[in-house]
UniProtKB/Swiss-Prot annotation:
Residues 6-198 form the Glutamine amidotransferase type-1 domain. The active site is at C83 (nucleophile), H172, E174. Its EC number is 6.3.5.2. It catalyses: XMP + L-glutamine + ATP + H2O = GMP + L-glutamate + AMP + diphosphate + 2 H(+). The lineage of its organism: Bacteria, Pseudomonadati, Thermodesulfobacteriota, Desulfovibrionia, Desulfovibrionales. This is GMP synthase [glutamine-hydrolyzing]. The keyword ATP-binding applies. Homodimer.
Length: 516
C-alpha cells in the first residue's frame, strides 16, 4: 500500500476532534475525520501515513461503547491514541483499565518517565502543563508498552510501543492549554510517521481547479448563488478559474442586505475577476412578504422560500445547466454524520435552503474539505481583498432578524446607517479583525430623549460585539469605553430617528449571538 501524506482521524465523539484535524493541517499535513464505525479496510483504501484515535465521552468499559477495529493496528502506519483512544488501545491489547467515580477535568503537570520520540525537543527534566478530560484510566499497560508519562494523580498518562509505532496519551495535546501539545503532534507527524508537509492552499487550489475542469463537460453550465459572504465568493472565484464563463453567478438582492453591499461586492467581482454575474433586484418582492410579519421564524421562512423561487426562476433562464455550486465547509460535512452513524457524504442543498428537486442538479462543493480559517487563507491565495476575506459572519436572513419586529424600509434604513457606523468605528479603532462579529440591532421600542431644547421619542439601537472561535460559544467583547462612546455618539448624531444606544453584555450560552 503506497502511503499518501494524509492522516486519518477516527472520531469517537470528542468535542475537540475537529481541533485535532486543524492542528495537523496547520502543520502542513492533510487530515480527514471519519466516524468510529469506519473499518480498517476502508482506512487502508485511503492509504494514510498515520492514524489518530480521538477522545470521546463514553467509557471503554461500557456495554455500548464505541469499539476499535484492531485491523487499524495492522496497517503498518503509526497510531496515536488520545484520551479515549489511549484507553481503547490499552483495553484491546491486553492492558487493564480502572473506572473512576469522578472525571478528571482541567490542567495537570506531565512528568516524563521515559524517553520517547513523541517528546523529542522537549525539556524532559521539567514537567509540562497538559489538559485532562477523562473518567477511566489505564491501570496496567499492555505487553510491549512502556509508561512514558505520568502526573501526580495518574500513573499512566502516556505510553508507547516504539517497535509497533503505537503511541498514546491520556491528555489532549490538540488544545491550547497543553503547552507542548503542538510540538508533540509535530513529532508524531514528522519524526515518527515521516510525513512530508505538502498541504497548502496553493496546492489545494491547483487540485480543485483541475478536478472541476475535468468534471464539468465542455458544454455544461454551472450556477452559483452569490451572497457577498466569503464562502460563496471563494467558490465563485475558484470555479471561474476552472471553467470561466460557464459559471453563472446569481446574486439575489433580497432587500435586507447591508448598506451598499450589492454594489460593492458585485462591482469588485466583475471588475477584478470578470465573473459572469447576474444581480436580481427582488427587493420589492421580499418586502411585500414582510408586511405585518413580526415573528422571526416566519421572517426566516419568507427569506428562504422566496429566495428559492427567485433563484430557480433565474436558473431556468440559463440553457444546459447541469451543476449547482455551493460553499459547504468541512464542519458541515462532519456534523451531518454522527460519530456512530454511517460513513456517508452529504448531498443536501442545505446552503441554499433546499432548492426544488425539479432542478435535478449535481452538486459541486469545492470547499467541502476546508475549515473556515482555511477558506480565508484560500481567499488570500486567490487575491480577494481584505473587505471580503475578513468580513464578519452575516446571517442568511440578513437584516430581517436584526430589525426586531416588523421589517419596513424606514426601519431598515435606520439600521443600515447605524450598522455602517459600527463597522467603520471597529475598523478605525483596530478592533474589527480582533473580534468574531460586531453589528447593530434595531429594537422594537422608542425612548424619551433630549436634543437641544426639545424632547424626543425615538428608536433604540443595541450594539452587539462578540468573540468566538466557531460560533458555538461566544463572549461579549470588552471594547474600550472611548470606542463605545464614539459609536454611540455618531449613531445618535448621524442617524435620524435614534436617540439611545445600548451595549449587549450577554454571552452565549445562555444568549445567542443574534437577537432573533
Amino acid at each position: 500500500m503506497e502511503k499518501q501524506n494524509k492522516v486519518i482521524i477516527v472520531d469517537y465523539g470528542s468535542q475537540v476532534t475537529q481541533l485535532i484535524a486543524r492542528r495537523i493541517r496547520e502543520a502542513g499535513v492533510y487530515s480527514e475525520i471519519h466516524p468510529c464505525i469506519v473499518t480498517a479496510a476502508e482506512v487502508a483504501a485511503m492509504s494514510p501515513s498515520a492514524v489518530v484515535l480521538s477522545g470521546g465521552p463514553a467509557s471503554v468499559l461500557g456495554e455500548d461503547s464505541p469499539a476499535l477495529d484492531k485491523g487499524l493496528l495492522e496497517l503498518g502506519v503509526p497510531v496515536l491514541g488520545i484520551c479515549y483512544g489511549m484507553q481503547l488501545l490499552a483495553h484491546n491489547l491486553g492492558g487493564e483499565l480502572s473506572c473512576s467515580e469522578t472525571r478528571e477535568y482541567g490542567p495537570a503537570d506531565l512528568k516524563f518517565c521515559a524517553g520517547s520520540p513523541l517528546w523529542d525537543g522537549l525539556k524532559t527534566d521539567e514537567s509540562s502543563r497538559v489538559w485532562m478530560s477523562h473518567g477511566d484510566r489505564v491501570k496496567k499497560v499492555p505487553a510491549g508498552f512502556t509508561v512514558t508519562g505520568s502526573t501526580e494523580t495518574l500513573e499512566v498518562a502516556a505510553m508507547a510501543d516504539d517497535q509497533r509505532r503505537i503511541y498514546a496519551v491520556q491528555f489532549h495535546p490538540e488544545v491550547h492549554h497543553s503547552e507542548d501539545g503542538v510540538r508533540m503532534l509535530h513529532n508524531f507527524l514528522f519524526k515518527i510517521a515521516g510525513i512530508k508537509a505538502d498541504w497548502s492552499m496553493s496546492s489545494f487550489c491547483e487540485r480543485v481547479i483541475k478536478e472541476v475542469s475535468e468534471q464539468v463537460g465542455p458544454d455544461d453550465q454551472v450556477v452559483c448563488a452569490l451572497s457577498g459572504g466569503i464562502d460563496s465568493t471563494v467558490v465563485a472565484v475558484l470555479l471561474h478559474k476552472a471553467i470561466g464563463h460557464r459559471l453563472h453567478c446569481i446574486f439575489v438582492d433580497n432587500g435586507v442586505l447591508r448598506l451598499n453591499e450589492v454594489d460593492e461586492v458585485s462591482g469588485y467581482l466583475r471588475e477584478h475577476f470578470d465573473l459572469n454575474l447576474t444581480v436580481v433586484d427582488a427587493r420589492e418582492r421580499f418586502m411585500k412578504q414582510f408586511a405585518g410579519v413580526e415573528d422571526p421564524e416566519k421572517k426566516r421562512k419568507i427569506i428562504g422560500y422566496t429566495f428559492i423561487d427567485v433563484f430557480d426562476e433565474e436558473s431556468q433562464k440559463i440553457p444546459n445547466v447541469k451543476y449547482l455550486a455551493q460553499g459547504t465547509l468541512y464542519p458541515d460535512v462532519i456534523e451531518s454524520i454522527s460519530h456512530k452513524g454511517p460513513s456517508a457524504v452529504i448531498k443536501s442543498h442545505h446552503n441554499v435552503g433546499g432548492l426544488p428537486e425539479t432542478m435535478k442538479l449535481k452538486l459541486i462543493e469545492p470547499l467541502r474539505e476546508l475549515f473556515k480559517d482555511e477558506v480565508r487563507k484560500l481567499a488570500v491565495e486567490l487575491g480577494l481583498p481584505d473587505f471580503i476575506v475578513w468580513r464578519h459572519p452575516f446571517p442568511g436572513p440578513g437584516l430581517a432578524i436584526r430589525v426586531i419586529g416588523e421589517v419596513t424600509e424606514e426601519r431598515l434604513d435606520i439600521l443600515r446607517k447605524a450598522d455602517k457606523i459600527v463597522q467603520n468605528e471597529l475598523t478605525a479603532s483596530g478592533w474589527y479583525r480582533k473580534v468574531w462579529q460586531g453589528f447593530a440591532v434595531l429594537l422594537p421600542l422608542k425612548t424619551v430623549g433630549v436634543m437641544g431644547d426639545d424632547r424626543t421619542y425615538e428608536h433604540v439601537i443595541a450594539l452587539r460585539v462578540v468573540d468566538s472561535v466557531d460560533a458555538m460559544t461566544a463572549d461579549w467583547v470588552r471594547l474600550p469605553s472611548e470606542v463605545l462612546e464614539r459609536i454611540s455618539s455618531r449613531i445618535i448624531n448621524e442617524v435620524k430617528g435614534v436617540n439611545r444606544v445600548v451595549y449587549d453584555i450577554s454571552s452565549k450560552p445562555p444568549s445567542t449571538i443574534e437577537w432573533e
